[in-house]
């Protein structure tokens, strides 16, 4: 009887691309260079996702998904010319200017959002820069929503320092003011304000003690280096934002960017992953454009470190996955919403 001959045992290991060092400057607290961010974006896709997921698990072990609802409380008629925005008065998009909603209308919408599972309620108004009387009216809305037990967020345009303080006194938890893109590409998107105007507003918000919500848009015709520049700008804010919404451009007929080339879905996932790596303690939010991504790409975004979504059938004036679709997606992925809380978060380290 002869014994069977077996092949010698061999061990196979996955070979990952050498890790990109977070740059000596970053380790010394000097911030992220555009080159260092670009090197992350250029990593092989699976290596990048592995690193982003490792970072995410280290800082967000509970693995929950924050559900935020965004309501346009004052729609249209904005004098700005942001090339992506259907609410600009300069573009013929079919969006009609409307007055500020009443306290009753807003609280009804906020209660419905809470009943559907949202924990944060965001209010957007299409102003370039609100007047003091607008801030007084918004303060009433903020207090009313806060009384429902929801976290509050507002995006109202450029703020002065005393206006930010008034919003803080009203109970505002977060203020959204996106950088949109890198400073080098900003003038290609909007010419009615300067990049520094956005940075100044963010400083007023931070000085008032309000948490910062700040991100950008992918797919506006920007080059890869501009995506790296945007992430570097966000990560180098001191401290970096508590919430970082990443939008995939929704191409709206009548806007200058309506014919922009759609962003490659995997490139969008890359931006999510690098946002997670460079801002590990931030809530990285899947924002506008989720509907065009599909379930599989959204799942990759969650794997890459996204842990917040805008939840509800509409985002300002553009469509969003309906609540039932999101509920089913999260259930399929085994993801759960964040427990409700109204306390503000501590600032993220730079």
Swiss-Prot record:
Coiled coil: none annotated. [2Fe-2S] cluster binds at residues 122, 153, 213, 285. SUPFAM superfamilies: Radical SAM enzymes. Pathway: Cofactor biosynthesis; biotin biosynthesis; biotin from 7,8-diaminononanoate: step 2/2. Keywords: 2Fe-2S, 4Fe-4S, Biotin biosynthesis, Iron, Iron-sulfur, Metal-binding, S-adenosyl-L-methionine, Transferase. Residues 63-281 form the Radical SAM core domain. Binds 1 [4Fe-4S] cluster. The cluster is coordinated with 3 cysteines and an exchangeable S-adenosyl-L-methionine. Binds 1 [2Fe-2S] cluster. The cluster is coordinated with 3 cysteines and 1 arginine. It is an enzyme of class 2 (transferase). Catalyzes the conversion of dethiobiotin (DTB) to biotin by the insertion of a sulfur atom into dethiobiotin via a radical-based mechanism. NCBIfam families: bioB. Belongs to the radical SAM superfamily. Biotin synthase family. This is Biotin synthase. It comes from Acidovorax ebreus (strain TPSY). The gene is bioB.
């Amino acid at each position: 009887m002869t014994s069977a001959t077996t092949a010698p045992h061999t061990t196979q290991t996955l070979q990952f691309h050498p890790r990109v060092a977070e740059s000596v400057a970053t380790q010394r607290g000097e911030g992220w260079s555009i080159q260092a961010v670009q090197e992350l974006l250029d990593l092989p896709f699976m290596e990048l996702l592995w690193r982003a997921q490792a970072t995410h698990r280290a800082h967000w072990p509970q693995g929950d998904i924050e559900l935020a609802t965004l309501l346009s409380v004052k729609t249209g008629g904005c004098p700005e010319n942001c090339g992506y925005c259907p609410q600009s008065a300069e573009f013929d998009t079919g969006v009609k200017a409307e007055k500020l909603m009443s306290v009753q209308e807003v609280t009804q919408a906020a209660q419905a959002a809470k009943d559907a599972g949202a924990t944060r309620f965001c209010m957007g108004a299409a102003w370039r820069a609100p007047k003091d009387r607008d801030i007084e009216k918004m303060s009433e809305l903020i207090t009313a929503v806060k009384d429902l037990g929801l976290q509050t967020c507002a995006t109202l345009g450029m703020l002065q320092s005393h206006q930010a303080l008034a919003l803080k006194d009203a109970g505002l938890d977060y203020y959204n003011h996106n950088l949109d893109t890198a400073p080098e590409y900003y003038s290609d998107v909007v010419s009615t304000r300067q990049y520094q105007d956005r940075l100044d507003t963010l400083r007023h918000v931070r000085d008032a003690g309000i948490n910062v919500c700040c991100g950008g848009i992918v797919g506006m015709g920007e080059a890869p280096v501009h995506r790296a520049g945007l992430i570097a700008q966000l990560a180098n804010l001191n401290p970096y934002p508590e919430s970082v919404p990443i939008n995939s451009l929704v191409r709206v007929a009548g806007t200058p960017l309506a014919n922009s080339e759609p962003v490659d879905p995997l490139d969008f996932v890359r931006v999510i992953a690098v946002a997670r790596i460079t801002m590990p303690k931030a809530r990285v939010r899947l924002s506008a454009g989720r509907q065009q991504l599909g379930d599989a790409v959204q799942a990759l975004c969650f794997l890459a470190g996204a842990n917040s979504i805008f939840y509800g059938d509409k985002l300002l004036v553009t469509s969003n996955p309906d609540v039932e679709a999101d509920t089913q997606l999260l259930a399929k992925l085994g993801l759960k919403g964040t427990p409700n809380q109204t306390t503000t978060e501590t600032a993220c380290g730079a």
